[in-house]
Amino acid sequence: MKFSHNWLNEYLGDTQDSQNLADTLTLAGLEVDAIEPVVAEKVSGVVVGQIKTINKHPDADKLNVCSVDAGEDELLTIVCGASNIYEGMKAPVAKIGAVLPGNFKIKKSKLRGQESFGMMCSEEELGLAEKADGLMDLPIDAPVGTDINKYLNLDDNIIEVDLTPNRADCLSVYGIAREVSALTKTELKNLEIPEPKVVIDDTKEVNITATDACHAYYGCIIKNVNNKIQTPLWMVEKLRRSGIGSISFFVDVTNYVMLLTGQPMHAFDLDKLEGRINVRYAKNNEELTLLDQTQVKLDCDTLIIADDKKALAIAGVMGGLDSSITDSTTNIFLESAFFVPEKIAGKARKYNLHTDSSHRFERGVDPQLAKKAMKIAIRLINEIAGGEVAPIHGAEDLANLNKQIKINLSIKKLNHVLGTNFDIEYVTEVLKALHMDVATSFDGNCIEVIPPSYRFDLEIPEDLIEEVARIYGYSKLPETMPKYAAAKTNISETYQSLDTLNMRLIDRGYHETINYSFIDPKFDEFFFADRGIAIQNPISQDLSIMRQSLIPGLINTFKANTSRQQNRVRIFEKGACFKLQDNQRIQFDRIAGLAYGELLNINWSNSKKVDFFDVKADVEALCNDLTSLSFEVCNDINWLHLGQSAYILANGNKIGVIGVIHPTVLKNFQIKAKAPIVFELDLDVLIKRQIPNFTKISKYPSVSRDISFLVDKSVLAGDIIKAIKALNINILKDVSIFDIYESQDSDRKSIALNMLFQDNLQTLDDKVIVESIDKVLEALKTKFNIEQRV
């Protein structure tokens, strides 16, 4: 929102300089982005002048010799080449000694032998415009000899405020003035709402069928207006200083009223309208040519203004070309309305548009402003362009327009939140300065507040507390240490914190990553048989499917790292995954990791590449609280390498997978590095910590025995361990494999086991140990056909 400081002062008086004003607004939450002078460089020695006579230059066809009244005793002779001059014209005159932008000093000069005692100026030469085709044509009532700085109010600054979406009430000069009045305790001048001088009875019937989207629509017919009238200079300048160029008189008036009040308006050519005015939703694919000459096909959820034959405008966004005002328009239909913000939001973006009107209607316009703004516009048109004014006519839903929100605010709560000691009188004074209705409750500690119609962002007590803090000044609030009431928190011993899981992987050299929850459809298709959940409005096409696993994201991160010369990668991620199950969207949490490259960072000792068993050890460390972790061969996951992958089980239930990424994955996704090892686990299982049972430590010595045997290569070492543990030998405390040897010349392999025996009641003798070992060997011979080595 840009505005002229001088224009603001018309409603406040000369309050403070622009920098102080900017500081006041910024500290109150209305951030000022920029302060710029109206002219970048000051002008001096320039006055209002009037051309008395014009004669052709004797030696130059394109030059004229003018006699100019600059308010001095004698007329000035000035040579001028502008094409738009005429006798009686008033224009800025730079006298000898004047200084223009660029430190351009005016001196007495000769042009083709003709002396010139000054220069008549265009907007460009005064620094008011980047380009101008001729002299600046001043109004005929401009006082000759008046300093141009004073006449054009050039001692002014343009202030630009970056408003948050909830402060649509400040998208107008008067809205900013209201705010400054409350902040500085300056008297706010009333906005004059003149009653139109009605002289004809013509009206247009208004029919609102989209009552959920439009709560008020007013129209006014003005006939026989002067279509040759030029926009007054004062209005052109106010528009320019607000960042809006002059287009035509009627458009300029609606823009001026919008900047002043915040109410967007539109003017139609009355003679191009057929029948009633209808506020309705568009028919699907209904066509409309807009003012910028683009043709759009409308969707059925787009609110439009139409007559009985055709669409006229996209409501709250932009008018149509076919009903627009032209140079030949003499009869106009002026529109002012209140549209529900939610029904306008997003419509401009849908049709690749952004207008000042849509910017305001999307954020919300004062529902009680439409008719007031129309009265201001009617008076301006009538006074400047003449015409015969008809009554304002329309349709309105007063119940919605006059809807009020009542908020109960506790002064005790306000002081508790802000750390202040405000009394009820001060809080009431602040809220009344913001034009709120305030009533005190019977106990004197609570007030009932009704916000003004334009402050629809105020709904709950906390909103009012913020308003009091803003007006009082955030910088003046007392600094107090936050109060913390310590309360005993019962944390279950069966819960494992996510931070603990994080640290277990970080301690083993992993780095946490965070990827999008969306993946490329080609990843989804390759990794999963069932298609994932599609996103209706994706960021991009390659992020349009909700992830069913964390692995695709880790592989993408792995690719990005290895393509940038990272030869050792350890990454993990935890997060939500999503899938369709029985036509229901299911969300579940996972933790996954990826390892690649050297086992250790570069050092003086010989290193080795990370392998399956290294990552298996990482998984075992991560699952330290699971008392019955095991692994089972996995042959049915297409993106893991056959023979180098396994399911991870807890208490016999599958909770995850581990394995080497299949080479086809690397090929399909153009990854040049060798295959990494990955794992993924059900996070819900890991955070449910298993509490170990107490086991008494034996005071008797343990006995260790080794056995070695041959077994078929197809037999898994893990199955042998399971078979031994299934015998439930009480004195067998632990069994582990310490050597495996395989020969190319044999279909059998050698496995060496270590068994640890201990009794809680007595010292073991060899006979008991031998019996236990024999029991183990007999079971293994029966199940796996082992052959003991001696």
UniProtKB/Swiss-Prot annotation:
Limits of the FDX-ACB domain: 698-789
Reactions listed under catalytic activity: tRNA(Phe) + L-phenylalanine + ATP = L-phenylalanyl-tRNA(Phe) + AMP + diphosphate + H(+)
Pfam family, one: B3_4
Annotated protein name in UniProt: Phenylalanine--tRNA ligase beta subunit
Chain sites annotated for binding Mg(2+): 457, 463, 466-467
Entry keywords, A to Z: Aminoacyl-tRNA synthetase, ATP-binding, Cytoplasm, Ligase, Magnesium, Metal-binding, Nucleotide-binding, Protein biosynthesis, RNA-binding, tRNA-binding
Cellular location(s): Cytoplasm
Name of the gene encoding the protein in the UniProt record: pheT
CDD domains hit by this protein: PheRS_beta_core (cd00769), tRNA_bind_bactPheRS (cd02796)
Family statement: Belongs to the phenylalanyl-tRNA synthetase beta subunit family. Type 1 subfamily.
Subunit and partners: Tetramer of two alpha and two beta subunits.
EC code: 6.1.1.20
Keyword Magnesium (UniProt): yes
Cellular component aspect of the GO annotation: phenylalanine-tRNA ligase complex
Cofactor: Mg(2+)
Span of domain B5: 402-479
Cofactor binding note from Swiss-Prot or TrEMBL: Binds 2 magnesium ions per tetramer.
Top class in the EC scheme: ligase
SUPFAM superfamilies, sorted: Anticodon-binding domain of PheRS, Class II aaRS and biotin synthetases, Nucleic acid-binding proteins, PheT/TilS domain, Putative DNA-binding domain
Gene Ontology molecular functions: ATP binding; magnesium ion binding; phenylalanine-tRNA ligase activity; tRNA binding
Domain tRNA-binding, residue spans: 40-149
Sections of the chain in a coiled coil: none
GO terms under biological process: phenylalanyl-tRNA aminoacylation
